[in-house]
Curated annotation (Swiss-Prot):
Involved in the biosynthesis of the osmoprotectant glycine betaine. Catalyzes the irreversible oxidation of betaine aldehyde to the corresponding acid. K(+) 2 binds at L246, K457, G460. Pathway: Amine and polyamine biosynthesis; betaine biosynthesis via choline pathway; betaine from betaine aldehyde: step 1/1. The keyword GTP-binding does not apply. NAD(+) binds at G150, A151, W152, K176, P177, S178, E179, G230, T231, D232, T233, G254, C286, E387. K(+) 1 binds at I27, D93, V180. The active site is at K162 (charge relay system), E252 (proton acceptor), C286 (nucleophile), E464 (charge relay system). The lineage of its organism: Bacteria, Pseudomonadati, Pseudomonadota, Gammaproteobacteria, Pseudomonadales. Pfam families: Aldedh (PF00171). Coiled coil: none annotated. Keywords: Metal-binding, NAD, NADP, Oxidation, Oxidoreductase, Potassium. This is Betaine aldehyde dehydrogenase.
Amino acid sequence: MARFELQKLYIDGAYSDAGSDATFEAINPANGEVLAHVQRATKEDVERAVVSAEKGQKIWAAMTAMERSRILRRAVDILRERNDELAALETLDTGKAFSETKYVDIVTGADVLEYYAGLVPAIEGEQIPLRDTSFVYTRREPLGVVAGIGAWNYPIQIALWKSAPALAAGNAMIFKPSEVTSLTTLKLAEIYTEAGVPNGVFNVLTGSGREVGTWLTEHPRIEKISFTGGTDTGKKVMASASASSLKDVTMELGGKSPLIICDDADLDRAADTAMMANFYSSGQVCTNGTRVFVPSHLKAAFEAKIVERVARIRVGNPEDENTNFGPLVSFPHMESVLGYIAKGKEEGARVLCGGERLTDGEFAKGAFVAPTVFTDCTDDMTIVREEIFGPVMAILSYETEEEVIRRANDTDFGLAAGIVTRDLNRAHRVIHQLEAGICWINAWGESDAKMPVGGYKQSGVGRENGISSLNNFTRIKSVQVELGDYVSVF
């Protein structure tokens, strides 16, 4: 017996049965409990959602900027009023510690929505003089119907990061959450409707990326895809979107980010930064700094500080607010992470701590993996080359600044990077040479609503958050006005 009732699709401002009886299970990864049975959208459901979105978008775009802004601000208020309720549901569905979801997931998502709600009246064009009798003006117009495809690690936050600029610009969005974590996105759809967003402007289709995601990327009347997920899937999304109708695509993809500890760094601060860059959200953050570069002569001292801090991690029931490290998001993902850990051991990396599944007591029912630190790693090891998306830190030693910059950039990814140093001249000098779209100096992980985020190389296309994301959900129309006589050459 599932804890919650059957989860339906959300189309045209209300819950709606899918076109088939097929469902999948939402599983609590802390104990294997079936939380809910979730309906799988069909291709016909995708078409229904598009028709609904087209209708709603016309109503939404016709509203004044202040009207749209006020409605989105009401949604912000509702999100904040229901913060704890939504955070508790997110914890059940993802396994993330309530101490995290309560203070981060809904809070930061609401901040992004508030930011874009404030920018709605600021969407403006330009006036360009040509001569005394003629000028050009530009308009920023909504794209129309767009689609968002989310990842499983920050379900409601990602849904808000994508829907906030889209709706602020006057678009309608069809959102497909990850099949692994679908529950809070459906609640977000309810909140948008309650706040006054017209029916159809935010529809939610649940199901697999292979089916529902593909139908969305291929649909000829969807103008843009905003995708968060793995690099391999992102390549397929881009190919599908361009083949069907030359859709605009924004993608936030994988990473294998470097964290460089300099020889002048405060080692306590360096260790604290490395812990946040590797074990926050049980290591399931795309920007994690999993390649930690440490000067050779400081490696032993740094390792000791890391081991000390790992011992203080409070692994446990994620619903307990004292817990700060929960299970991985699913049992299949746990097996993937354990496979990488086994590979690290096989290839000669030394386990400093962790390195196994936790099975004592209540842990046996869940997808718990011990916080794991490998040292004596080399650049060619699988755990150093590939994104693990779990609580696995790899410590690498280096000798010179030139060397560490070269090695930090020796990756197909380019999502994030960081440096810990007391010398700000060095910090900027190194950061400016790192091939990464998001960089931190003496910190790790904060992504404010005003901060554009996205990757270099195979870590993404385009940016989310900041003013640039709002502009990316509009298209520019140029209009020339002639006030004088018009003379034909014919």
